[in-house]
A protein has these predicted regions:
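Short coil turns linking two alpha-helices in DNA-binding domains
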Residues: 45, 49, 98-99
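A secondary-structure capping/hinge motif
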Residues: 57-63, 106-118
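An amphipathic alpha-helical interaction segment
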Residues: 1-11
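Conserved hydrophobic/aromatic pocket- or pore-lining residues that grip, position, or stack substrates
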Residues: 1, 28, 53
Length: 136
């Protein structure tokens, strides 16, 4: 007996591949901070196979894993560009990285600069901005 697509675990009946891709993106962004975010978890949540999920992203020239890493890296960079008290390790761990050295390596590979350079620059700017303001 053949099962309907939904019961078989595919989401072809919910607006097609474009809609499923958008749902995958939304799920990923909602769970970026989870260090255990996986392709298995995403495909189960969307009700599709891992193979189909891979195909959705592959058709757009990126793998699911690359999409997750890029999104995490962009969020980390944005957070590092805000002067504050967070360390690089705190930022990396808060966005799902489990090793600060691994984070620094892939950050440099992706952006061409070490996260410490951005962090130091923003810390200096934050101190200068704070020093230029009159006391309250």
């Amino acid at each position: 007996m053949l099962l309907p697509f939904r019961e078989a675990g595919a989401s072809f009946d919910r607006g097609g591949p474009g809609a499923l891709y958008e749902r995958a993106q939304a799920f990923i962004h909602d769970h970026l901070r989870d260090p255990d975010l996986s392709i298995d978890q995403i495909s189960m949540a969307l009700g599709c196979t891992k193979r189909y999920l891979h195909m959705l992203f592959s058709d757009r020239g990126i793998t699911v894993s690359e999409y997750i890493w890029r999104a995490r890296l962009l969020n980390c960079r944005q957070e590092l560009e805000i002067p504050g008290n967070k360390t690089i390790t705190d930022v990396a761990f808060s966005w799902g990285f489990s090793s600060s050295s691994h984070f620094s390596r892939i950050f440099r590979k992706y952006f061409g600069i070490m996260p410490s350079s951005i962090h130091r620059s923003q810390q200096r700017n934050g101190l200068q901005d704070g020093a230029a303001q009159p006391p309250a």
